[in-house]
Amino acid sequence: MAKSPVNNAAQRVRKKVRKNVADGIAHVHASFNNTIITITDRQGNALSWASSGGQGFKGSRKSTPFAAQVASEVAGRAAIDQGIKNLDVEIRGPGPGRESSVRALGALGIRITSISDVTPVPHNGCRPQKRRRI
């Protein structure tokens, strides 16, 4: 049996709620393959986010510092629209987009109050993967 056409009222589109938040946290996840930037308020509610792959970079170009810079600018502009003025930056991961993403946020005029490295380090937990042989 064929499905009936969906009502427009049933398709709810959530409107962006503009919050007025002055201070926030920028979570930069820099892996070897991609860089993801999420800007949250102090409680951890996401205000904006962007990734290198989401900005049109594909394959090995996602992991470049320039791709991380572009993603940071997009996330930063959206956060400025939400009222962000001060940011604490938490960097996670060893990727090449670590530094350039922080510089891009600072260049937008956002005051960076602290930069901290929160990369998870095991206290000799799980056995690591075998060595790559190229």
From Swiss-Prot:
GO molecular function: rRNA binding; structural constituent of ribosome
The entry's keywords: Ribonucleoprotein, Ribosomal protein, RNA-binding, rRNA-binding
InterPro entries linked to this entry: Ribosomal_uS11, Ribosomal_uS11_bac-type, Ribosomal_uS11_CS, Ribosomal_uS11_sf
GO cellular component assignments: ribonucleoprotein complex; ribosome
GO BP of this protein: translation
Physiological role: Located on the platform of the 30S subunit, it bridges several disparate RNA helices of the 16S rRNA. Forms part of the Shine-Dalgarno cleft in the 70S ribosome.
Subunit structure: Part of the 30S ribosomal subunit. Interacts with proteins S7 and S18. Binds to IF-3.
Family: Belongs to the universal ribosomal protein uS11 family.
HAMAP family, per the entry: Ribosomal_uS11
Protein's recorded name: Small ribosomal subunit protein uS11
Source organism of this protein record: Verminephrobacter eiseniae (strain EF01-2)
